C-alpha cells in the first residue's frame, strides 16, 4: 500500500497542532495558571515545555518519519534484529482507541451546546441534565463519529488535511475575535490580573509538578498521536523547528482561552473552576448574562467544536492508519469499520452517566474516568518513557539514528550537547510524573 503524503508543510503543522489542541487547553491550562501564580506559573510552564514538550515531540516526529508506517509497526520497522520493541505498537493502538472511547462523547457535548446556542435554546442548558440524557449523549456521539470518519474516508490531502487547514484557521480567527471582545468587558482588568499577575509565593513543589504534567500531557505524546503525522511528511525540514512551531500554536490557543474566559467570569462574578464545569456551566452562564450572548456563545462553542473535532480527527486518523496497515483495507471500508467500533466502545461513556453506570474508582467516578485513567495516567507517560528509551539508547533504535533523522532538512537541529537531556533527564522526569500521578490518584 503506497504511503500517502501531506501536501504542504502548513498542513503538517496544522494537523499536529490540531491534534494537540483540545478541550483541556480551554478548561485546564487557564485555571491552573490563574490559581497557581499567574505569570510566574506561565514562566515555569514554558520552561517545562522546553525541557519536556519539545524533546518528546521531536522524538515522536522522528520515529514516525523514519519508519514511514503507522505507530502499530514503527517500533518493529526500526528495531534491531532480535529485539522485541514491536510489541509496543499495540500499546499505541490501545491508547488511541481508549482516548476515543470518551473524547468523542466530550466532543458531542460541545456540538450539543453549539447547536443549542445557535437555536436560541441556551437559557435552558444544564450540564447535569445533558450528561444524564441517554438520547442526547448517544445522538451527538453518533454525529461526532459520522462527521470524523466521513472526512477520513477521503484521501489524506483532500479529506483530513484540507478540512483541518480550514478548521484551524477558523479556530484562530474565532479565538482572536472572542479575546478582543473579552478585553472590552468591564471585568477584564480584574480577570487579566487574576490570570497573569506573577505571584511567586504560590509556587511550590505541587505547582511545579502541575506545570510539568500540563506541559507533558497537552501534546499527547506517547501513543503515536504525533508520529503518524511525521510519517506523512518528507525530509525537507528538520524536526526541532517543526516541533517548536506546533508547540507555539498549542500554547497560543491555551493562552487565548484564558484571555477569553477570565474577563468574562469576573465581569459576571462567576466562580472559576477547573474541568468541564468551567466550559459548560460557567461559560454558558456568562453568555446567558451577556448582551448579544446568543451570538457570542454560538461563536465560543463553534471554536470549541473546532478544537475538540481537530483532536478527534487526528486520533481517529491514527486508528484508521493502524487498522488499514494491519488489514490492507481501503480508506472507505476502514472508516466504516473503525467508526462503528469507536461508536460502540464510546457507548460505555455516553451511557455511563445513566443506564450503564459503573464506578471504577472513588465515589462519583464513571466510565469516562476509567478511560481517562487508562490514557492519561498510564499509556501517555509509559508510552513516552518507552519512546525515549527506544530512540536514545543502543538497546533500541539508538541516539545516532535518532539525531540523523531529526536533523535531516533545513531548520533548527538537535545539538550533541542535548544528548543528556533526551537520554537521562527526559526519561527520569517522565518516570517521576507517572509515579507521582499513581501515588496521588484518588483510588477510593
Segment roles from a protein language model:
Residues 1-28, 56-61, 65-78, 82-87, ...:
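Membrane-interface "cap" regions at the ends of multi-pass membrane proteins
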Residues 2-6, 10, 161, 165-309, ...:
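Membrane-embedded translocation segments of transport machinery
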Residues 3, 107-132, 232-236, 241, ...:
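Helix-loop-helix connectors at the membrane interface of multi-pass transporters/channels
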Residues 3-4, 31-36, 66-91, 104-159, ...:
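Inter-helical loop and helix-membrane interface segments of multi-pass membrane transporters/permeases
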Residues 5, 11-13, 19, 134-139, ...:
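Loop-to-transmembrane helix boundary motifs in multi-pass membrane proteins
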Residues 10-48, 227-230, 240-244, 248-251, ...:
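Transmembrane helix-boundary motif of multi-pass solute transporters/channels
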Residues 309-314, 335-353, 369-403:
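Hydrophobic alpha-helical segments of multi-pass membrane transport proteins
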Residues 361, 366-391, 411-444:
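A generic transmembrane alpha-helix motif of multi-pass inner-membrane proteins
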Amino acid at each position: 500500500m503506497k504511503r500517502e503524503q501531506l501536501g504542504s508543510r502548513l498542513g503538517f503543522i496544522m494537523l499536529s497542532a490540531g491534534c494537540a489542541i483540545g478541550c483541556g487547553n480551554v478548561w485546564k491550562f487557564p485555571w491552573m495558571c490563574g490559581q497557581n501564580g499567574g505569570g510566574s506559573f506561565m514562566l515555569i510552564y514554558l520552561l517545562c515545555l522546553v525541557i519536556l514538550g519539545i524533546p518528546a515531540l521531536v522524538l515522536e516526529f522522528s520515529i514516525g518519519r523514519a519508519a514511514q508506517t503507522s505507530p502499530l509497526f514503527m517500533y518493529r520497522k526500526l528495531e534491531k534484529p532480535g529485539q522485541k520493541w514491536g510489541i509496543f505498537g499495540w500499546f499505541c493502538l490501545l491508547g488511541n482507541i481508549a482516548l476515543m472511547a470518551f473524547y468523542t462523547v466530550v466532543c458531542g457535548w460541545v456540538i450539543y451546546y453549539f447547536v443549542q446556542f445557535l437555536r436560541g435554546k441556551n437559557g435552558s442548558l444544564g450540564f447535569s441534565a445533558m450528561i444524564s440524557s441517554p438520547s442526547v449523549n448517544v445522538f451527538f456521539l453518533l454525529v461526532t463519529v459520522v462527521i470524523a470518519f466521513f472526512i477520513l474516508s477521503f484521501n489524506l490531502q483532500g479529506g483530513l488535511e484540507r478540512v483541518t487547514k480550514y478548521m484551524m484557521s477558523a479556530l484562530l480567527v474565532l479565538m482572536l475575535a472572542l479575546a478582543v471582545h473579552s478585553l472590552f468587558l468591564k471585568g477584564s482588568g480584574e480577570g487579566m490580573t487574576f490570570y497573569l499577575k506573577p505571584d511567586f509565593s504560590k509556587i511550590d513543589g505541587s505547582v511545579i509538578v502541575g506545570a510539568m504534567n500540563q506541559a507533558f500531557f497537552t501534546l499527547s505524546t506517547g501513543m503515536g498521536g504525533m508520529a503518524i503525522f511525521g510519517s506523512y511528511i518528507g525530509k525537507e525540514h528538520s524536526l526541532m523547528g517543526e516541533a517548536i512551531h506546533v508547540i507555539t500554536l498549542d500554547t497560543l490557543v491555551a493562552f487565548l482561552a484564558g484571555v477569553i474566559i477570565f474577563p468574562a467570569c469576573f465581569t459576571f462574578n462567576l466562580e472559576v473552576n477547573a474541568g468541564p464545569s468551567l466550559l459548560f456551566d460557567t461559560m454558558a452562564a456568562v453568555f446567558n448574562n451577556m448582551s448579544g450572548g446568543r451570538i457570542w456563545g454560538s461563536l465560543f462553542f463553534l471554536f470549541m467544536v473546532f478544537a475538540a473535532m481537530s483532536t478527534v480527527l487526528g486520533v481517529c486518523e491514527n486508528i484508521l492508519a493502524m487498522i488499514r496497515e494491519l488489514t490492507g483495507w481501503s480508506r472507505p471500508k476502514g472508516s466504516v469499520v473503525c467508526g462503528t467500533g469507536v461508536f460502540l466502545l464510546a457507548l460505555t461513556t455516553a451511557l455511563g452517566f445513566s443506564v450503564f453506570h459503573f464506578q471504577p474508582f472513588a465515589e462519583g467516578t464513571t466510565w469516562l474516568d476509567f478511560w481517562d485513567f487508562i490514557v492519561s495516567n498510564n499509556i501517555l507517560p509509559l508510552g513516552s518513557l518507552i519512546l525515549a528509551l527506544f530512540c536514545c539508547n543502543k538497546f533500541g533504535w539508538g541516539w545516532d539514528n535518532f539525531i540523523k533523522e531529526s536533523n535531516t532538512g533545513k531548520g533548527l537541529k538537535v545539538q550533541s550537547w542535548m544528548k543528556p537531556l533526551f537520554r537521562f533527564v527526559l526519561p527520569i522526569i517522565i518516570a517521576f510524573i507517572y509515579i507521582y500521578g499513581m501515588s496521588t490518584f484518588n483510588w477510593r
